[in-house]
Amino acid sequence: MFRRGLVFSRHCHYSLIRPRFPLNRTCLARFADGRKNLATDNRTQTYQSWRGMISIRALLLAAATSVGLYAYFQHEKKKVLERQNDKVLATIGRPQLGGAFSLIDHHGNRVTDNDFKGKFSLIYFGFTRCPDICPDELDKMSAAIDIVNNVVGDVVYPIFITCDPARDPPQEMAEYLEDFNPKIVGLTGSYEEIKDICKKFRVYFSTPKNIDPKKDDYLVDHSVFFYLMDPEGKFIEVFGRNSTSEDLARAIGSYYLSRKKQK
């Protein structure tokens, strides 16, 4: 009985400490290889992930560099074109618009082109009985002058020259200009004086034939432009009816600042 128990005890002890399904070396090797392959896969995935992130960063950096280079070359191209344009203008000159004149201002004083040198001049041709175009353009001029005065100061003379001197004496001009910017200077004169200044600026104007300015009501057909002159009285640029007050102010301010830098 004791021997049976001893055998049974040994058998149980042997069974407990010995695995029912023994692991041979092949299984252990496969297990080790699996862990090794898993680690390799993890490292590969991590490397590929970092490689993908680096590729994205490289693409973004390349794109940003391309945009920066494009903007830089566009800026340089613009500067080159501006220099070329300046050389052309210096060679062939700007259109010969403007010139000497002697007219009467809306206060009744005789003035010449020399009285308006030292500042820029913004000149418009029209007449006081103009129903719509002239008032709109003078409103535009008034707004542009206000902008310029607020940004860079009092650097421009706004000038309104009549194309209808027979009906626009100084007093008529003064009353008409009360509705606009007080800085605007009205200029009138004899028919020949007005004809001469219009010819120098290539301004077209026409009045009906066989009329009496004191009795007949009529309209004057004329071209609609603003003429910007520099402080020496030389022509700079012309602006059509589609130009806004902001366009006028921007141009005046730009030319003023450009001249200021050159001094």
From Swiss-Prot:
UniProt binding sites for Cu cation: 130, 134, 222
InterPro entries assigned to the protein according to its UniProt record, in alphabetical order: SCO1/SenC, Synth_of_cyt-c-oxidase_Sco1/2, Thioredoxin-like_sf
Extent of the signal sequence: none
One Pfam short name: SCO1-SenC
GO CC annotations on file: mitochondrial inner membrane
Keyword Metal-binding attached: yes
BP-aspect Gene Ontology terms: intracellular copper ion homeostasis; mitochondrial cytochrome c oxidase assembly
SUPFAM superfamilies xref list: Thioredoxin-like
Annotated disulfide bonds: none
Location within or outside the cell: Mitochondrion inner membrane
Main localization of the protein described in the UniProt heading: mitochondrion
GO molecular function: copper chaperone activity; copper ion binding
Record key words, sorted: Chaperone, Copper, Membrane, Metal-binding, Mitochondrion, Mitochondrion inner membrane
Family named by the database record: Belongs to the SCO1/2 family.
Protein function: Acts as a copper chaperone, transporting copper to the Cu(A) site on the cytochrome c oxidase subunit II (COX2).
Protein name: Protein sco1
Organism: Schizosaccharomyces pombe (strain 972 / ATCC 24843) (Fission yeast)
